Amino acid sequence: IEYVNKVPDDYVEFSSDLNFAYSGAHDDGPVFKAEVMEDKWDMYVYGERLYISRSWTGKLCFVAHCEFKSDHVEIHRISADSEFVSGDLRHAGRVVDFLIKSHMSNMVVPHPLPARLREEPADEIAAYSFEMFGRRGLFGSFDETIGILGEQG
């Protein structure tokens, strides 16, 4: 409840065209809670918003403004803490897409890598991946990741 009607500190807001399959019913409250330290995110739905926060600090990082339909959810707008944008609004959208797929749907999909890491050594990329996505960040991609359908984990 602490996040209701809040946005991340130092946020940017941008439009989105994300959509996901949906059962048609939900209750307000947590939709994903970290079970172990290697889970890096918590996710809550209140009203028409999905709040995504860092699990161990509670820092609110993303708010996805949702439109719940009978069989899918559309996300038309995202508010993101500028720290997670990496100078690329599309990248921030990819992060939200990955978090929904990997955490709420338990899918195995590639996580997005920011362009700034393209020239970095593999160990730097691996460190970023673990810090950002923990045990769900199995493999990353610099390419477009929205639209990739994964396998159930």
Question: Which sequence ranges carry the predicted segments?
Answer:
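Negatively charged, low-complexity tracts enriched in Asp/Glu with abundant Ser/Thr
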Residues: 1-47, 125-153
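Polybasic, proline/glycine-rich intrinsically disordered low-complexity segments
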Residues: 72-153
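Canonical SH2 domain fold
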Residues: 48-68, 77-78
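A generic structural signal for short, non-catalytic loop/turn and secondary-structure boundary residues
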Residues: 36, 45, 57, 71-73
